Amino acid sequence: MTKLIFMGTPAFSATVLRGLLADGNYNILAVVTQPDRAVGRKKVIQMTPVKEVALEYNLPVYQPEKLSGSQEMDELMNLGADGIVTAAFGQFLPTKLLNSVDFAVNVHASLLPKYRGGAPIHYALINGDERAGVTIMEMVKEMDAGDMISSDSIAIEESDNVGTLFEKLAVVGRDLLLQTLPAYIAGDLKPVAQNPEQVTFSPNIQPEEEVLDWNKTARQLFNQIRGMYPWPVAHTYWQGERFKIQEAVEAEGEGSVGRVIARSKKELIIATGQGALSLKTVQPAGKPKMTIADFLNGAGRDIAVGDQFGDQ
């Protein structure tokens, strides 16, 4: 039985970990995940999804703030693991740790060399890609730069957002890893180097990137909104305050950019640089997320055709 150290943090990683545990060919010696964090307005301390799985299976859990130079890393190196599997861990692995095992592989949610970095699923949606995928790759010191062992992809559906694609690709990654790992460990798969000329990056979304520019086309804004939902959530401004938009669809119509061109009890359509957007789920400042109908019957009851969105 192959002895592994597993490293990961979000639900994507938890799906991969459950797959390894159910497979029966792997002995998970330890699980490494990010420290518990305070989340939400009430700052409730919350463990990571990977930690929840680890505790469910009574696995040893390590949560170093920084792995490099930590006591936890020394302990991990002394476990006698054959290899390391990572999936959206969130930290760089020191070369010293990588060199202490026979192999180290990463489950990365993109079709490398496209979208190295921490937000590949977001960028696949924001850029309007037709497909998204997962690559199993060897771990090296440079971020997501290792040789590629295997990859698989799925079509991006019109209804997908970051949350749905995250869940789908977690299953793709789990299955691909379980199919790939035995042959890789046996030496029957030869990894392929990434083409440096095709490398692109997907750094974590910055706050200024969350703002909707109504001069863009309706299609671009549609992709931005779904490419940031359920996190970090795209926003515009209404009456000078932040106005989050969780869901919208393309609509017919033209008009002055950012202005309301149609309004009913259940519909609010805003003109863009090309075409229009019909808002479906929104969150005004200081309010919970709500349907556009609830907004128009409440805080937005006075909105009229010609009103402007986007001005701070």
From Swiss-Prot:
Keyword tRNA processing included in the entry's annotation: no
Binding site for (6S)-5,6,7,8-tetrahydrofolate: 110-113
EC number: 2.1.2.9
The reaction(s) this protein catalyses: L-methionyl-tRNA(fMet) + (6R)-10-formyltetrahydrofolate = N-formyl-L-methionyl-tRNA(fMet) + (6S)-5,6,7,8-tetrahydrofolate + H(+)
PROSITE patterns on file: GART (PS00373)
MF terms (GO), sorted A to Z: methionyl-tRNA formyltransferase activity
Family annotation (SUPFAM superfamilies): FMT C-terminal domain-like, Formyltransferase
Top-level taxonomic group: Bacteria
Coiled-coil intervals: none
InterPro entries from the UniProt entry: Fmt, Formyl_trans_C, Formyl_trans_C_sf, Formyl_transf_N, Formyl_transf_N_sf, Formyl_transferase-like_C_sf, GART_AS, Met-tRNA-FMT_C
Gene Ontology annotations for the cellular component aspect, listed alphabetically: cytosol
Record keywords, A-Z: Protein biosynthesis, Transferase
First-tier enzyme category under EC: transferase
Family assignment from sequence similarity: Belongs to the Fmt family.
Function: Attaches a formyl group to the free amino group of methionyl-tRNA(fMet). The formyl group appears to play a dual role in the initiator identity of N-formylmethionyl-tRNA by promoting its recognition by IF2 and preventing the misappropriation of this tRNA by the elongation apparatus.
Name of the protein: Methionyl-tRNA formyltransferase
Organism: Streptococcus suis (strain 05ZYH33)
Gene field: fmt
